Structures are given as structure tokens and as C-alpha cells.
Amino acid sequence: MQTIEQQITNIIEESLTDMGFELVLVKFKGVNTKVVEILIDSLNGNKISIEDCTNVSRTISAILDVEDLIEDAYSLEVSSSGIERKLVKFENYNRFLGREVKVKLKALLNGKTLYQGKIIKAENNKIYLKCAEQEVLIDFNLIKNANLVLTEEVFKKLLGS
């Protein structure tokens, strides 16, 4: 059986793609006060605006109301995935080739569970990182979580320098 997050993902992802957004993450939390948290990113690389979040929120709210997945009252929060966004899907690694990433693993790989380096390749369910000391090959299924890292290079691009 699918989790509520998976069910929500299945019913909203296509609509968000049609609107020009990537669904990065769905979180359902709370016991007494339920919250559906949605993280989005732009498919064309543009910054996410408050207006974008508002439009996505309206669309998702309408879909969730029709599908009636959540029995009780809930709050819906839509926000940008941010500069140090999570990399959840394998495809994300190809999109961010050359970017610095911090990867936490489910189990030891070469005696470590935490790696930071540039994404140099992503293919056949494997991620290739160029770390300070070496190149590392990581099986995607071994990744617990991963985030982009804000580097000076990225910061300068954001400032337009």
C-alpha cells in the first residue's frame, strides 16, 4: 500500500509538470494538526516566486479536494525547494551535473556514510562524485538523502557576478 505522500505525488505531479514545475518533495506531518508540505522547483531554471507558490497551492488544493485523500482538516504549505535543495529522484543528478552535493548514505561505503563532492556523472542508477580526495561511485539505492551545497561559485552566479 502506498503512503499518503506517494498518493499525493501520484495525483499532483503531472499537473505541476504542466505548469512548468518539478515536484521535489511531498511531506505529510502532524497528528492533531495535519500539514501537507510541498517543495517545488522550476523546470526552466527560473527562481520560484511567491506568486508561483500561490498558483501551485491553488491547483494542488483543488486536486486534493476532489480526490479527498485526507479525511480531516489540514494545512497546505507550498514553497521553493531552495538553493540547497534535496535531490530525491535519480534524474536530479543529471540536471545538476557539475554542482556540489552532500550525500548521506544508508550504509558504509569505503568506511564512510557522508560524502561531499561535484556530480560528474549519473548513469545506470550510479552517481559519480569528484570528492577532494578521490572519485566515488555511489549506487543510487544506497543514498539516504542528498542536498545541493551553496558554494562560492553558485553564490556569485546568483548575484550575477
Swiss-Prot record:
Cellular-component GO terms for this entry: cytosol
The entry's keywords: Cytoplasm, Ribosome biogenesis
GO biological process assignments: ribosomal small subunit assembly; translation
Main location: cytoplasm
Listed Pfam families: DUF150_C, RimP_N
Coiled-coil stretches noted in the UniProt entry, renumbered to this chain: none
Cytoplasm listed as a keyword: yes
InterPro entries: Ribosome_maturation_RimP, RimP_C, RimP_C_sf, RimP_N, RimP_N_sf
Cell location: Cytoplasm
Disulfide bonds: none
CDD domains to which the protein is assigned, alphabetical: YlxS_C (cd01734)
Entry keyword Cytoplasm: yes
Parts of the chain that traverse the membrane: none
Annotated HAMAP family: RimP (MF_01077)
Family: Belongs to the RimP family.
Physiological role: Required for maturation of 30S ribosomal subunits.
NCBIfam families: PRK00092.4-3
Name of protein: Ribosome maturation factor RimP
Species of origin: Rickettsia typhi (strain ATCC VR-144 / Wilmington)
Gene symbol of the encoding locus: rimP
